[in-house]
Amino acid sequence: MVAEVCSMPAASAVKKPFDLRSKMGKWCHHRFPCCRGSGKSNMGTSGDHDDSFMKTLRSKMGKCCHHCFPCCRGSGTSNVGTSGDHDNSFMKTLRSKMGKWCCHCFPCCRGSGKSNVGTWGDYDDSAFMEPRYHVRREDLDKLHRAAWWGKVPRKDLIVMLRDTDMNKRDKQKRTALHLASANGNSEVVQLLLDRRCQLNVLDNKKRTALIKAVQCQEDECVLMLLEHGADGNIQDEYGNTALHYAIYNEDKLMAKALLLYGADIESKNKCGLTPLLLGVHEQKQQVVKFLIKKKANLNALDRYGRTALILAVCCGSASIVNLLLEQNVDVSSQDLSGQTAREYAVSSHHHVICELLSDYKEKQMLKISSENSNPEQDLKLTSEEESQRLKVSENSQPEKMSQEPEINKDCDREVEEEIKKHGSNPVGLPENLTNGASAGNGDDGLIPQRKSRKPENQQFPDTENEEYHSDEQNDTQKQLSEEQNTGISQDEILTNKQKQIEVAEKEMNSKLSLSHKKEEDLLRENSMLREEIAMLRLELDETKHQNQLRENKILEEIESVKEKLLKAIQLNEEALTKTSI
């Protein structure tokens, strides 16, 4: 089941386990992470806990008591009723008062979906607690002690490495390299690396020496291990890599070095968190910016289907939400429970984030509307319409021209038929017309006879011819004006197309310039990293040289002391011999 959604409470607002410290006594440190390392045990002088309170707690918790408190295990008395259930009302009040510690402290609450923390009960932060080793002197042999404390002369270390196996493990499966890297003893680390010890050995929590060095923020040891080929993609029992711990510690230098040596920027831990999602979850804004520049996947999902944007909204981090929205992330993506980032913001009452999301949606809608109303498409439509008009006008002109000879032919045929019917001019037609009809061969004889007539023999008046010629002139003028208009429109289309081509060329040039800038930026970053590594190497060489000088001075002092002692012994012996004589 997916837990209810609410915003993560601030560290100051989280209630610590309400009176349980004083009443539980010594068990408080074992069960509650908030009490570990605080130095305030709240125990009396006897160091015992309040038995009466523990009895009431057992009776109310029932069967969950054995899971949660070591003092109840193996007692044989479960204090469970006949139903075998615990007091739900008591557990509800306990959860509400304890807040986020409830899921860490009580196994009965883990995975139940009834956490009062909302989404934050899902992730176990115990992987990032107590990064340094807890070391007891009696559990370590000579080599491991020397690696941990680092206050042993180099000669003695070399002798130890000859006599013992440098890859030997202690009870917690730690090698000398683990201990030296976790405690920042770079001289011991360098000596072990020069002797070619195993780099990727796992301790009892499946962590390598590189992971421990990153976790404990020992930068010098990290660089040494990476230079000698340590694997940065090995996952511990929580699924975290060295990059996860660098992001959690907000150590940009270590993150850069790990990525430079091939660390996977998209590796997921057991909670499904990539380094970017972990940075968002822990509200590490500077590291999130760095990972975005390194092109981390902004659409990666955790095990509950939540994106970086949804996690940022649930955390209530408006700055990270704004940073992600600048990268044009998908606002409408849903997690496994079917909720979006906006729904989480509304349910958590994050008004600033709601405004950011609504403004972003409005901008996206405006972009989509502007893309739909594309000027290129409008120009194409106008050019197509104009070409169709031109075609129609061209088709109409030959039709008019072809109709005129057909009308003339029909008239000539009618005249010939009338002549044949009435014989020799009964209607009183002019002689030249009948002679032309009889002398001509069919239609061809009539048409030239019409053309050769003089003005006095014409049947139609001059006004009709003038009107006909004026109509022809008007038609030609119209055609010329249409041709001029089409020519102007074509010129406009050509100019628009030229403008579009120029705009497209400018866009291409800008994109190319941006890509060149990005490449230059990447090259600069690589050169900067190489310079930083070179500077670190120089510092390491200087420290080595200084240490060698110190060792030489110490050896000289030891030899001088030995000589003085030998002289003193000789003098004492001579004095003894004299006294005996």
UniProtKB/Swiss-Prot annotation:
PROSITE patterns: ANK_REP_REGION, ANK_REPEAT. Signal peptide: none annotated. ANK repeats lie at residues 172-201, 205-234, 238-267, 271-300, 304-333, 337-366. SUPFAM superfamilies: Ankyrin repeat. Residues 377-392, 401-412 have a biased composition (Basic and acidic residues). Residues 489-577 form a coiled coil. It comes from the Eukaryota. Residues 369-494 are annotated as: Disordered. The keyword Coiled coil applies. Keywords: ANK repeat, Coiled coil, Repeat. Residues 476-494 have a biased composition (Polar residues). Belongs to the POTE family. PANTHER family: ANKYRIN REPEAT DOMAIN 36-RELATED, POTE ANKYRIN DOMAIN FAMILY MEMBER D. This is POTE ankyrin domain family member B3.
